[in-house]
């Protein structure tokens, strides 16, 4: 989720008026903070949605803890009732998407499943990898890895200005941000990163 918009605002500044940022935040109270921050910064190139991305359209329940960065989709009916929608139903197919940034507290696989058509026009995904959070939803990094590979991505860890490809058997940190990239040459050209051998 976009939370209060720290990354959303930074990305909006980076792409400028010719670019567009689309952000999603399911928690109604946090969504109001997001909206307020966008208004306060007078950003016109941001579109926001008060819902959770999922692999199905409907409703779900969302936690409401004080540490709002830890809120997540619940498997039970406790919490705040929220709308869920598939990424594919936003019909974002007119223009290529340079970057999909995703941090949904372990719900990543379901977001990707609901956006399988959209993934065809995305070159790069920045996502949080936390195996213990995936277990809350009864899948593993191995399942996520396979799904991304089947959709023509290669997975990389990064440090400083270097990316290094990882494999299903690679040892990862307990919590780590990763990149899923289709066109490596384009990514390296646009970012000035280098590829580790």
Which role fits each region the language model picked out?
Residues 2-197:
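Phosphate/nucleotide-binding beta-alpha loop and adjacent structural elements of enzyme active sites
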């Amino acid at each position: 989720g976009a939370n209060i918009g720290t990354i959303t605002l930074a990305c909006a500044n980076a792409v400028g008026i010719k670019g567009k940022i689309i952000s999603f935040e399911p928690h109604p109270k946090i969504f109001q903070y997001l909206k307020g921050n966008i208004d306060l910064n007078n950003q016109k190139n941001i579109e926001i949605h008060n819902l959770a991305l999922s692999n199905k359209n409907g409703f779900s329940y969302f936690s409401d803890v004080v540490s709002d960065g830890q809120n997540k989709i619940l498997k039970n009916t406790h919490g705040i009732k929220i709308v869920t929608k598939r990424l594919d139903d936003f019909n974002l197919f007119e223009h290529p998407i340079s970057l999909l940034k995703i941090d949904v507290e372990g719900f990543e696989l379901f977001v990707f499943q609901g956006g399988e058509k959209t993934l065809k026009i995305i070159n790069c995904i920045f996502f949080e990898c936390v195996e213990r959070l995936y277990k809350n939803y009864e899948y593993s990094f191995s399942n996520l890895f396979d799904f991304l590979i089947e959709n023509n991505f290669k997975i990389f860890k990064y440090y400083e200005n270097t990316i290094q490809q990882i494999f299903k058997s690679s040892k990862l940190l307990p919590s780590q941000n990763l990149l899923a990239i289709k066109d490596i040459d384009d990514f390296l050209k646009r970012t000035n990163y280098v590829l580790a051998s």
